[in-house]
Amino acid sequence: MDAGDAWGRSSSSSSSAAAAARRLQARYDLYMGFDDADAAGVEEVEARGGGEAYNCPFCGEDFDFVAFCCHVDDEHAVEAKSGVCPICATRVGVDLIGHLTMQHGSYFKMQRRRRVRKISSGSHSLLSLLRKDLRDGSLQSFLGGSSYVSNPPAAAPDPFLSSLICSLPVAEPSKDLHSDSSDNNFLLNKFPDDKTAERAEPSLSEKDQKERAQRSKFVRGLVLSTIFEDDNL
């Protein structure tokens, strides 16, 4: 009796180990992909539409095929023993993940191919756009255009320089203008020209105006000659 129990326990443990090994191999194939999928399986995938979403029979959430298998293996490991295959709609009495990987492994091949095709097509389109931009930019540079030359962003003002500029004394131009106008008025009053003398005394006769102009010229010449003589000394 004891020997029979021991033999039963050993046989059950060996069968459990074999089942665990099969599950591990199936999951390894699940994550690595099936590179040896046959053409008949690929045709089955194309006929059924491998890119559709699969509804989890336990929680009702939608997944793609790979995500569905991972979800069932992680979240519904116990319920999967009596689950229904979402692909062939048959009631499975064994591990659902094992059934999916063994009977419908061509789905993995198709999804892997589609992912590679999407990545390659996206990379090709991106490279095409980059080549087009580079070609257009080179043409614009050759023609002297500036459509591809962006203006550099305005640099932020240095706070130290801003404070230094604000602290500098501001010149007062009004005082300088006032001093210049005062000097000009002094010179005009001291040495009036002919037109100023004529406008200042319009009531004088023409003869008097000429004499006044001559005297003013004489005085100016005398003053200038005196200044030049002082400089020569």
Swiss-Prot record:
Region (Disordered): 176-215
InterPro entries reported in the protein's UniProt record: DI19 (IPR033347), Di19_C (IPR027935), Di19_Zn-bd (IPR008598)
UniProt biased composition (Basic and acidic residues): 191-214
Record-linked PANTHER family: PROTEIN DEHYDRATION-INDUCED 19 (PTHR31875), PROTEIN DEHYDRATION-INDUCED 19-RELATED (PTHR31875:SF26)
Family per record: Belongs to the Di19 family.
Name of the protein this chain belongs to: Protein DEHYDRATION-INDUCED 19 homolog 2
Organism: Oryza sativa subsp. japonica
Phylogenetic placement of the source organism: Eukaryota, Viridiplantae, Streptophyta, Embryophyta, Tracheophyta
